[in-house]
UniProtKB/Swiss-Prot annotation:
Molecular-function annotations in GO: structural constituent of ribosome
Organism of origin: Desulfitobacterium hafniense (strain Y51)
Record's keyword terms, sorted: Ribonucleoprotein, Ribosomal protein
Entry keyword annotation includes Ribonucleoprotein: yes
UniProt cross-references to PROSITE patterns, sorted A to Z: RIBOSOMAL_L17 (PS01167)
GO cellular component assignments: cytosolic large ribosomal subunit
Organism domain of life: Bacteria
Name used for this protein in its record: Large ribosomal subunit protein bL17
Amino acid sequence: MAYRKLGRNTGHRGSMLRNLATSLLKHERIQTTEARAKEVNAIAEKMITLGKQGDLAARRNALTYLLEEDVVTKLFTEIAPKYADRQGGYTRVIKVGPRRGDAAEMVLIELV
């Protein structure tokens, strides 16, 4: 299986990952579970690569996935130019220990 189901049906999982990707690009750092971070990591990498292309078609593709237009603008004007000379590896995942309620492994995912 090429992806994690994360205990959700298809629509809920897709919405959750879109929200996480939008939040990560907006705040440049979020705290979530390890499984969610691994999934959103791939999405964020693809969005930043789209931002590096910089053309109108790439912007429209990013708009279909990210939920906020100002986040897409930030992606294309601030985030993507920062990684112009970097070939992938735009995010970093740092373990922060188990969550108090259910001992789920929590991580901090941030843009490098």
